[in-house]
């Protein structure tokens, strides 16, 4: 900033903006530290994988994999976990990622497949597909919270990786923006549920819509909120059929809409959480049985531990 800028904004404002710019530079340097460390170990390019819609009771599960360039001049300003960004910022950063990434891949798993596989299995399946769909084969894969078995590349899970690793943050943005756009399209098809507002997650308004209209084909029957709404709707129809005012309905016992075999609702379908740890520290693969290396990792996890 030159003298004219200082005169226009004032010294205090200029100092504040300089501090803000410096803080953002340091944040980005820190966000890319995993890619730098892996590059020093000869492991590049690095893919980051994350999903959107895991906890929603309607709509698809979307998984993205992204490989960013390692050149510091190619860093994406403002990149962060999608949950920390405004919708407008996500859209802007999404466009930057798509235009500047070495490779990216998106997998959309419909609600019917989520019900069939279960949320956790669908998530892992989507991660495998997303990595396999990359045009550039990664030398290493970093995931947010869950490791992926069966890849051709070694990989590790990072606690809160979408907050701590650039390529995972990029994947979180791509997955989130893609899914939000799909939910807006579903809103046009099923406007009574207001999917464009809550994006398929459980809210008071979404519960009220389910109570009024029952589930639509985009709702996940494996989630207890949806099953209960479906059961109430079946009961209401049966009560109408049994009443004298509705002779046109066939009578019969009330039946709740079942979920898929073996499902126990959203609580049990939710995936096991990653081992506890501060954001940006790799999960200890020896202490977390289901968060372990793929078996073909030639370097121990400790090599990537960063204080």
From Swiss-Prot:
Residues 44-235 form the RNase H type-2 domain. PROSITE patterns: RNASE_H_2. Gene3D superfamilies: Ribonuclease H-like superfamily/Ribonuclease H. Residues 287-296 have a biased composition (Basic and acidic residues). It is found in: Cytoplasm. One of its GO terms (biological process) is DNA replication, removal of RNA primer. InterPro entries: RNase_HII (IPR022898), RNase_HII/HIII (IPR001352), RNase_HII/HIII_dom (IPR024567), RNaseH-like_sf (IPR012337), RNaseH_sf (IPR036397). One of its GO terms (cellular component) is ribonuclease H2 complex. Keywords: Cytoplasm, Endonuclease, Hydrolase, Manganese, Metal-binding, Nuclease. Manganese or magnesium. Binds 1 divalent metal ion per monomer in the absence of substrate. May bind a second metal ion after substrate binding. Its cofactor is Mn(2+); Mg(2+). It catalyses: Endonucleolytic cleavage to 5'-phosphomonoester. Its main location: cytoplasm. Residues 241-307 are annotated as: Disordered. One of its GO terms (molecular function) is RNA binding. A divalent metal cation binds at residues 50-51, 144. It comes from the Bacteria. Its EC number is 3.1.26.4. Residues 250-280 have a biased composition (Low complexity). Endonuclease that specifically degrades the RNA of RNA-DNA hybrids. Belongs to the RNase HII family. This is Ribonuclease HII. The lineage of its organism: Bacteria, Bacillati, Actinomycetota, Actinomycetes, Acidothermales.
